[in-house]
Amino acid sequence: MVFRQAPVELPGLAPMPGQPFGVYLHVPFCLTRCGYCDFNTYTPAQLGGVSPDRWLLALRAELELAAAKLDAPTVHTVYVGGGTPSLLGGERLATLLDMVRDHFVLAPDAEVSTEANPESTWPEFFATIRAAGYTRVSLGMQSVAPRVLATLDRVHSPGRAAAAATEAIAEGFTHVNLDLIYGTPGESDDDLVRSVDAAVQAGVDHVSAYALVVEHGTALARRVRRGELAAPDDDVLAHRYELVDARLSAAGFAWYEVSNWCRPGGECRHNLGYWDGGQWWGAGPGAHGYIGVTRWWNVKHPNTYAEILAGATLPVAGFEQLGADALHTEDVLLKVRLRQGLPLARLGAAERERAEAVLADGLLDYHGDRLVLTGRGRLLADAVVRTLLG
């Protein structure tokens, strides 16, 4: 059942000068829901009222209101996520980017990314979105092992993701990412090695690898609770991470964030904005935005989202304004995950003392005036942050 949420009025927003500005666009559509996924996505059976075209109209209305509120700043990155953006098809994705251009100033060197599922892409799709101005594609590979794909409820064939990446490259994309998941119950070391090798051999310049997390309320969580599947083991997850890192490093990829590796120049600029103090407007059902010291989030259900925008009102469900302590905590939490490291100047005297203990434990190294996670430190990044912050 959908309950109408009263929209909340956002305070005035003042983008910080000199910081990159991005736009995130959330596509809430999926043909089926993967068992591990807790993202804000909906299948056709769950929606009924909101077609892709009605959603596009609502999104256009939000972008118009956003541009008016912000005085149309220059956009350096655009990221279309989901859900399954590729379900829209190439023409609708082209329209989506035109909508951003209609309401904002798109920088000449803007990075424009879209997520895609391998089973809903084909060469003409990639040709269409490349011609429209997209510069980067991120494909959900997860694994090449049939048993792993089955456990994750993925519907593409084992070789389809790598083939899709090859098609994207052939149609002119120089920046292509493949997402992997490691630690799935039933996965072997060999399954993971073959998956990493397949990603490298596809010719991509970026690989993301995430440990499987059993999210509350998902089909996977119910299977684990019933004893049908074992929960991921922390020691196994650490070993698998090391396998990924070693395999990618040997292939010429370098880590630049704990879960992300790339060839030189292949970093995802939009995601770097999230981790390194950037600002963005999040448009679409359930999307989050962050500008100045204000973070906000939209209503989640696409029907409610469209209804509110039909009244020319921003569909904001809530917001918070971060004080100095919260901003500092986020700064440490995010920057410590980056290869460029955490500037010592950002730490207070007590935090520097605690950092010495972490350095002595071999979890951090000095790189000039910055603290950078060691290989072992990356496995314990959350614990490092907790120690630094006390």
Swiss-Prot record:
S-adenosyl-L-methionine 1 binds at Y24, G82, E115. S-adenosyl-L-methionine 2 binds at G83, T84, Q142, R154, D179. Keywords: 4Fe-4S, Chaperone, Cytoplasm, Heme, Iron, Iron-sulfur, Metal-binding, S-adenosyl-L-methionine. Residues 15-254 form the Radical SAM core domain. One of its GO terms (biological process) is porphyrin-containing compound biosynthetic process. PROSITE patterns: RADICAL_SAM (PS51918). GO terms for molecular function: 4 iron, 4 sulfur cluster binding; coproporphyrinogen oxidase activity; metal ion binding. One of its GO terms (cellular component) is cytoplasm. It holds the Pfam family Radical_SAM. InterPro entries: Aldolase_TIM, Coproporphyrinogen-III_oxidase, Elp3/MiaA/NifB-like_rSAM, HemW-like, rSAM. [4Fe-4S] cluster binds at C30, C34, C37. Its cofactor is [4Fe-4S] cluster. It is found in: Cytoplasm. Probably acts as a heme chaperone, transferring heme to an unknown acceptor. Binds one molecule of heme per monomer, possibly covalently. Binds 1 [4Fe-4S] cluster. The cluster is coordinated with 3 cysteines and an exchangeable S-adenosyl-L-methionine. Was identified as a high-confidence drug target. PANTHER family: COPROPORPHYRINIGEN III OXIDASE, RADICAL S-ADENOSYL METHIONINE DOMAIN-CONTAINING PROTEIN 1, MITOCHONDRIAL. Belongs to the anaerobic coproporphyrinogen-III oxidase family. HemW subfamily. This is Heme chaperone HemW.
